[in-house]
């Protein structure tokens, strides 16, 4: 996927690899441990001793009942009703949009229709009570899962696992932003990022549950389609748990806006097992022809992960008899689910919330919807093309329409030991024994030896390795990946730029903590608290040399010029920050912003200029992102100023209002002193210099002053203003380049202070 648009759509989510052995829409389930609490759970108000469950836990606002005489469920659903969404056209819109994005970003689609069918859209009948505003996005997600699933059915084990791993990394970049996840730049990852952004915009907390569910599916199924199952009893639990529960649970709860706690999921898990078995078996039954064709076309596959195939092997029967057995199993599991659900409602209704009951009821519609939709979709009937050529406008139970309606929006003491000369000699050996080994020859006449062994770099690198190991959001890495949507820098050069920026950034962290006398860094002891000030300074200086050497390897005079120029500016900015603190001199707002442009924004400016120098594009096609990186640097620094005073996470990682201990003139403090000069506050700052820190009580007093002058409110307003301006600048750049940057938009969303 070397095209620009493929790279562009990729970066916008640190999300990025959205896969799903969506063996089908309807065979997914969730692990209880992944659900999130979203406030107080509404408990049932049923009367004690109630001898019957409510007829329905769901209020039908968004769907209508389909006349059973107009469809045939083959007797597989035990009489479960079929409902269809009133805005099914939104589901069609989401499916078509996903297919268009795939063709544009990934490649051609063959023999694929996904959720679409001439009569019913799969999501419209599987989740008929989906919140209308979420229907298009949910269908897009399921369509994307189908497309990914089709890849898995046509590749070998290693390629399939890599497809899943790529998708998992995309989820991890959002769910675990502190991890240094290596992002893919494929078109599929761009689609994943785009989708994640849409889901987060609709409902961030519930979207995170869905993303975690999807991640669990991807990780659980990796390589599972290549398992050699010998019996249905062996296959089905694996199919249900690893290829079903996580994804579909996340889809249903997000689509319907349900909040189901971990405890409720544990309690209802035995109830839902036969429901997911029904979905899995039905999917395998209807998708048999499709999967068998793909199986025959893939010589690397030795077995099919399909219930019909396994029944044929287990019982030594032909295809038709295996299908009959499979149908019987579907009916049995469906009836078992209905029995367990009724029993649970009668005996344990008050133990869970209404939303948990709604989830259980929603599964019934997923069962009937899956069975009926599967009979219409050419996904499983591609050998009958007359069923599908174009989606019709239907003003019946399918409710298809052109009206869009709703937009989707180191080392212990050592000892010298004499050994024979054939033992390798080294001056430092950090072995587990803590013993340094030297030869007799070395002990006798080292002063005359001019070709002594090279010294290890372990000591000089130890502080760097320590600070690198601390938790980090890897914002700079994500920013580089996002910008590369526009610059298209080759991967080898891009990695060297990342390495150089990492080395500079970590050097600045070590020196900053010394200069600010900060004992904590990201909730851990600062580097100089472990290795001492002198060793830390030396290690930081070494990093500057290492970064220069890395830039040299880019073999570009322009890159060297950029590196030296921006490094000078970075040190100038830091010198001003230190000068104001040391002399208790409050800068003007203009001086503060310019300092930020030099210091914090310097690395972002360096990144953009280095990427511009190494871009294979002509200079007129390389976008000017200087305004964007300047604004981003300001937003990043002001956000840090604000969070240092207001965020519990910052308090846990660095200490309570650590900027006040350091005497740093942050934006809130500058605003306070500028708008309402205060002798008491100025005296506090001078005393801080004398004492080296502030007491807890004094910090509270400073915060009171900041509140009185509305300086914290002002800082938040500046953040909001910058956030809006950043999006406008992003709009301009996307228009100029013709490439959307979803990864950069996702990064801005992650950094947004609410």
From Swiss-Prot:
Residues 392-403 have a biased composition (Basic and acidic residues). Binds 4 Mg(2+) ions per subunit. It comes from the Eukaryota. Pathway: Secondary metabolite biosynthesis; terpenoid biosynthesis. The keyword Protein biosynthesis does not apply. Residues 1-24 form the signal peptide. Its EC number is 4.2.3.-. Its cofactor is Mg(2+). Residues 58-388 are annotated as: Sesterterpene synthase. Residues 392-414 are annotated as: Disordered. Mg(2+) 1 binds at residues 149, 153. Mg(2+) 2 binds at residues 149, 153. It holds the Pfam family Terpene_syn_C_2. It is an enzyme of class 4 (lyase). Asperterpenoids A and B, but not the final product asperterpenoid C, exhibit potent inhibitory activity against Mycobacterium tuberculosis protein tyrosine phosphatase B with IC(50) values of 3 to 6 uM. Keywords: Isoprene biosynthesis, Lyase, Magnesium, Metal-binding, Multifunctional enzyme, Signal, Transferase. Residues 389-753 are annotated as: Geranylfarnesyl diphosphate synthase. GO terms for molecular function: lyase activity; metal ion binding; prenyltransferase activity. This is Bifunctional sesterterpene synthase astC.
